[in-house]
Amino acid sequence: MIVFRITMNVIPVKQLEIMQTLISMAEPTAQEAGCISCRIFCDIEDKNRLCLLEEWKTRKYLDHHIASHRFGVLLGTEALLREPLEIQIFTVSRSEGMDAVHRIRNQKKSNISPTDGHGSLIK
């Protein structure tokens, strides 16, 4: 899985315009082949700091999205930002959920030494 995170620090008077752009992009992006999810987040301490978080099945799907006209529209918003877009691409080889939390918490209760998730002790 590929996680694509775009952080935007918006000029305050342009916040509504950027939000409208992101909202108009989110649903069509979520419908693209290979897109697992596309969500918009707002920093609770700074409403002008926004994050677009996308999850993709493969890098090939993400690359196709990045080359699209729709993504070009997002790149065109740079003039409405206080600083350049911060873009990060993460390749996730493994993910865990609540079962891992329960397992870890049960280990702690049993006074078992912590491991790195692969059986090796954490020092």
Task: Please state what every model-predicted region is.
Residues 4-7, 21-24, 28-31, 40:
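N-terminal leader/targeting segments and the first structural element of proteins
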